[in-house]
A protein has these predicted regions:
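Short active-site oxyanion
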Residues: 58-60
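Vicinal oxygen chelate
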Residues: 1-35, 40-53, 76-110
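Short hydrophobic/aromatic beta-strand micro-patches
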Residues: 10-12, 62-66
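Short amphipathic alpha-helices within nucleic acid-binding modules
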Residues: 68-74
Length: 110
């Protein structure tokens, strides 16, 4: 298995949170998990977001990896990898139904 490092947890909300940032590709407002004491990222989807199913309905756990393809081998693809500026991210579903985000950062981060 590809080496993984915990990055953050993503939680769905319908409430506006402070310091939200807009992600046009997925039409979602997100908070910066790096500024949360427990690395929680809040996601607030717009009604017309193209994101459907488990990614939009369930919390997710995100891991850093150097290779999304190797890390996600054998997993169901929920959202194909895309560029969010600072990283390439993709969403997958584990055998037991957990939503997993794999992230390949473009630069080293703490």
């Amino acid at each position: 298995m590809e080496k993984l490092e915990f990055d953050h947890i993503g939680l769905i909300t319908n409430e506006k949170k402070g310091n939200e940032v807009w992600v046009e590709k997925t039409r979602v407002w997100v908070t910066d998990f790096a500024h949360h004491p427990y690395r929680a990222e809040w996601l607030r989807y717009e009604p017309d977001s193209p994101v459907k199913g488990p990614v939009r309905e369930k919390p997710h756990v995100a891991f850093r990896t150097s290779n999304l393809e190797k890390a996600s081998k054998g997993m169901k693809v929920l959202l194909e990898p895309f560029d969010v500026g600072f990283a390439i991210v993709g969403f997958y579903e584990s055998d037991d139904g957990a939503v997993i985000e794999f992230m390949r950062y473009k630069k080293e981060v703490e």
